Amino acid sequence: MAHPKHQVHPEDLERPEAKDWLASHQDTALKDLRLKFGLKRPYASWIAQLEVQRKYANKFPSLLLANWIFPTGQATEQSSSERTALYKASLISSQFTVDLCAGMGIDSWAFTQRDGSLGHFANELDPGLSKLLKFNLKNT
């Protein structure tokens, strides 16, 4: 994952002012926000979410609406799309599933959305991604 200062922190997006800040900067150029706020918390997390909302709206349509918190960089780029994850989940008939390389958790989320899903185990070794994975799966 990215350098620790570049990681998204879930607690930054739970702050009371986060939604208002994101809404008021929806149309502001990302480069301008980065120049103004740099890597300062909570702004770096908020700017990262704006970037994901703009760049990946078609890849994660319902998760963006569900306030899923996305990591910066490669994990978001390489993850399954929401549509692909739901398709993969539809191929599995077991009531229990395991994802040993969960990444940011899109496939894990899809496994838990299936009818008849009774349990899912998700594992991620990267500490930053693991923190987001736990937060997102608990809150969706």
Residue spans for each PLM region:
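SAM-dependent transferase fold signal centered on methyltransferase-like domains
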Residues: 1-140
